[in-house]
Structures are given as structure tokens and as C-alpha cells.
Amino acid sequence: MIDPSSSFDRIKKEARLLREQLHVHNINYHVKDDPVISDGEYDRMMQRLIAIETQFPELSTPDSPTRRIGAKALTAFETAEHAIPMQSLDNAFSDQDVIDFHNRTAKILNTSDIRYTVEPKLDGVAVELRYEQGSLTLALTRGDGTMGEVITDNARTIPSVPLKLAPAGNGTIPDVLEVRGEVIINSKDFEGLNKKRLATGEPLFANPRNAAAGSLRQLDSRVTAKRPLEIFVYGVGRAQELMANFDIGSHSALLESLKRLGFRINPLIRSGLSLTEVLDRFKAFETMRQDLDYEIDGMVIKVDDIVFQERLGTKARSPRWAIAYKFPAMEETTVINDIIVQVGRTGTLTPVAILEPVNIGGVMVARASLHNQDEIQNKDIRINDTVLVKRAGDVIPKVVKPVTALRTGSERVFVMPTHCPVCHSPVRRLDNEAAVKCINASCKAQLKQRLKHFVSKGGFDMEGLGTKLIDQLVDRTLVGSFADLFTLDRETLAAMDRMGEKSATNIVQAIERSKRIPLKRFLFALGMAHTGESAAQLLSSTFFTLEALLKASAEALGAIEGVGPKTADSVVAFFANPDNQETIARMMENGVVIENHTVVESAALDNATFFSEKRVVLTGTLGTLTRSEAKQRLEEQGARVVSSVSKNTDILVAGEASGSKLVKARSLGVTIMDEQTFLEHLDRG
């Protein structure tokens, strides 16, 4: 509510000041990742400006931050011409293609001393933003490169799109500036968006790129405002004044100037690279790809020197000074030949698509989990369907959607069985869960999966006890519980198919070595529902001994940060089961020794390290350690590694391409540590 005693001039001045402050804070948060005020203070300032502009509409300006909320709906999109065409890029698919590009470039320039700027090729939607006297006046999609759709109202809703440019360098702002960038939705936000659509019965987006494109093409910008869009700027259209004002001689200098004006530039961009360094950087992108917050499908390579760019010129559809080095395709179409059902260690029935084998990203894919009946129904996936299958990094292949246009009428609807396909016991769907479960605890399929988990590296680590051997042992009724593994002898094992005396001896020795096990690995090995490695570590470091854990109530377990009610109930129910109690007792009778947390971590507890008892979050990509290696070393030094940032987090280790966790950590005042500092503390112990 506006104070009626305030003069119009005072209110006008306040509105102007609020707009200026909100623009600065918006750049600090979305571009610099360095907020200086709390979210609550930002919201209060925004609400105050909204109140002023609502009561005095004449005070609202085209570049007001309130425009991010959205404007009234359009009936159709207008189109407009790009002053300078938005060309596409030629593609490279191998190192040799890039070498050929370099050689062609060197021949035209008559020098091989060429430096490049490289950037991740974002899998999003290309747009152009036009600024006049520093204010956003027009936003266009790429369209056909010559004409694009006008999406100005929608672009204004994107938090990382500056509505007003920040003076930089010599303090001047170009009269006209056209910048180009990629609008994306990060992976986590995409999952959240699809969950909301699933809950409201709306069709799901196939991938983040489609979601971004669909969001930008909303006629009602108020819908766009609710979508988690963001932008990275990578270049310019008309920018003669900018280039002259800042005496810009390279692409890297151009990006730095754009950053000073308030645009968000991708932190993974590297400049001044030789050909060899370019090829090395591509390999680095392939490695870090799966850890990024957003999807990339390759790397863009640009000649850095602007004079060289001008000498190289352009072809009809693409510049000669840039090329896109694409990753191997991570999406392909294939046919679902059948859908089978597998039974997991907790009894969950999982439908699995048997695919016509297809090469995706260099890996032959012949099957993919369909998760549950709801997933199949929501996506309308059928046997004999042609489907789009996706594989990103090392992630398990996923059926994205059916290609309904290719249906022939031979497709069949899949129905989840009412009885377990292995033991034929009735199955049951639990309340509020999508999973269907076999309720027979003696089901051989469940037993096999539990045993495979039990002997895995994260559990008892019984080297040599593989899938086929476990199947034989269960099928011949030689093993019916975890405890039976510790009674196996050389003669029994040697009698199995494809098993000689030496192999049998090695397995017996591996079983013997496994008998001494840390509490956290013991808990993980048991395969309790909702209890993975992180939960097992939290339980171990909280209760220290199995005896203390057995006495804990579900309420006490649920109170541990990182242990939810499902895990708490599962652990209590597991240890209350008489059969499980008997199995654990038999294991101990056969020589299993559970090392208490205090014994396992004695070095960390008796000789406190920098990380002792600290809650640590890892984000981004580390250059020298994998995520699991870093986690292991932290835990060895007494740290508690958690997955999300909260007010209780002590340290955030920020690797390359750190995202939203870094922003949140800064806003909460969490200590942020780069990789070099992190390694130094680890090495000091």
C-alpha cells in the first residue's frame, strides 16, 4: 500500500531508485553468481515496485524488472528481420575434421599460428536480443536465420536477460546493440517441470531443449514467466559501436565486454588455445558432460582474432571462422521388440524394454528400463513401437517417447502382470507408490538380486562371486541367505559350471578376507530399502556401532539430516524382522566382524583433520579426482559428505562448472573452496 501522504515526485524517485537497485541485484545474482542481498530483501523490493507501478501505471517503464512477471497474452507471434543473419555452423564429428578446419583456416590466413576460443555447445534455443540506449526493445528467435519470431515479452521474463544494460568500461552504453545467446532449462529444473506437468495431466516434454522452445513460444508471457529459463550469451549481431568503444580485437575480449555490460557468459569458455589444446578441451567436455547442470551436445570452436574472422568471412549459411565439434549422437530411434519384467532385491517388478540393438554414443544399447506401469501409460509406450532412446554420459539408456507417426497398427499395449514372473506369487501395489511388488520374501529372483548387491564392491566386496555363479548357487539351493555365503567351501564351488580348483580357491580366500567389514559397508550390503551408500554412511557416523543402531527408534533415525522417514521406517522394520536377526547372528557365528565406526575412522577421530566432523558438499567437475574418489577421501578424514546445500553445510567444494549449489552456498554464507585449496587440505590430512 502506498502512503497517500507521499508526494508524486517522491514516489517517482523511489520507483526509479528501486528499478536501478533491482537491475544491479539481478546482475549480481544471475550473471555474477554473487548476490549481496538476501532473497527476502530482493522480494520485498520487487513487491514495493509492483505496488507503486500498480497504483501509478504511468511510472512503469519498458525496462522495469516487474516486466519479468509477464504481459497480457498475444493472439499470434509477429516476425521481424535480423539485421545481420543468424547463420548456422558447419559440423565436425572427429579430431580429423577439426584438423582439416584448422588447415583450411591456416591456408586462407597464410599462417598456422591461430588461437581459438572454445565454448560448450548448449542444447537450447538460439535468440537475439536488441538493446537501444541500453534498454531491451526486441527479442527474436533464430527462425530461418533471416526472419525470427518476436518474443520480447517472453524474453523479459527470463531472470538472466538484462532489461537494462550496466555502464561499463568508459561508462558508455551503445545506442544499438544486438547480442545472441542460447536459452536453456537446466536438467534439475526440467525434471521438476515435468513432475508438475505429470501431476496436472499435461503432456511431458521430451527433453530440456523442447521445454525451452515450448516455453519461449507461449503466446501468454505469464506462462513463460513460470518456466525456469536462463540464458548464456555467446556473440553479437549489430555491435559496431560496442567494438569501437571498447577497442575490441578478439572474440574473448568481446565476451568480457558483454559480461561487464551485465550479460551472462558461460564459465566454461576458454580462449587463446592452440589446435592441440582445442582437441584436449573437447575431451575434457566429454568427461565433464554428465556432471553439468545442463545439457550440451558438443563444443563450438571460434577463431579468436577479430581481424582474422573478417578476413575469413562467411559462406552462404555459415561463417568460415567457426565450427561445431559435435559429440556422438546420444539419441537414436529403434524398435521395442518386447517388454519383459525383472524382479529386484526388494521385490519391485520393473518393466524392461527389449530393443532392436542400436549404437548410441559408441555403445550398443539393447534394453532400457521403463521403470513402472505409470511411466509406460503416461508416455503411451507399446510393444513394437518405434521409440526415441536417449543415453547421456554413463547414464542408463532411457526411452524418451514413442514416434507415434510411425505406428503401423501392430503395436500392443503392455499390462503389468498380477503375479510374480519368477515365483508366481501375487503382486501388490503399495499406497502412494508407483512400484508393484512381489510380496513373497522367499522369491528366488529377489534373493539373487539381494546376494549380488551384498557381494558388490560397496558391500562385502567378494571378488569372483559374479552374477552367473550366484544364479547357480541359488538355483541349486546351496545358498538361501547372506549367511550361507560364509559356509561355502572350495569343493562346493569347484563343482559349479565353468569353475576350476584355482578359481574356487580364490573365491574362498575372497570370502575370508571380506569377513572384516566397516559398519557403513555392512549396512549398505544388507540392501535395506531406501538405504544407499550415503544413508549407510550417515547411520554409521551417527550411531558408531550396530548395537546402538539396533536400539534407535524410527523417530531418532528420521531426525538425522539426510535420512528421511522412508529410510528410517525401512531400517527399523528390517532389524525387527526375526529372519533378518537370525541371518545376522549366523553371519557373526561364521566369523563376520563388524568394525565400529570409531575403529574404522580412528585416524580421523583421534587425529582431527581439517575436515573432521564437517558437512561437505561437492559440486562441479574436479580435474584430478572423480566425485566418488573425492567423497572417499573426505570420509577417510572424518567429513560427512552430503548432497545438498543448507544452512548446516560447512564447506562447498566448487569444481569446474559449478551451478546452483554455488549460488545457494554464497547466499547462505557457506565456506567455498576451490579445487586447489581442497587438495591442499586433503594432503595435509
Curated annotation (Swiss-Prot):
Q: Indicate the residues that form the catalytic site.
A: 121
User: According to the lineage, what is the superkingdom?
Assistant: Bacteria
Q: Which SMART domains match?
A: BRCT, HhH1, LIGANc
* InterPro entries with a match to the protein in the record: BRCT_dom (IPR001357), BRCT_dom_sf (IPR036420), DisA/LigA_HHH (IPR041663), DNA_ligase (IPR001679), DNA_ligase_CS (IPR033136), DNAligase_adenylation (IPR013839), DNAligase_N (IPR013840), Hlx-hairpin-Hlx_DNA-bd_motif (IPR003583)
Family assignment from sequence similarity: Belongs to the NAD-dependent DNA ligase family. LigA subfamily.
Described by its record, this protein's role is as follows: DNA ligase that catalyzes the formation of phosphodiester linkages between 5'-phosphoryl and 3'-hydroxyl groups in double-stranded DNA using NAD as a coenzyme and as the energy source for the reaction. It is essential for DNA replication and repair of damaged DNA.
According to UniProt, the name of this protein is: DNA ligase
Q: Which organism is it from?
A: Desulforapulum autotrophicum (strain ATCC 43914 / DSM 3382 / VKM B-1955 / HRM2) (Desulfobacterium autotrophicum)
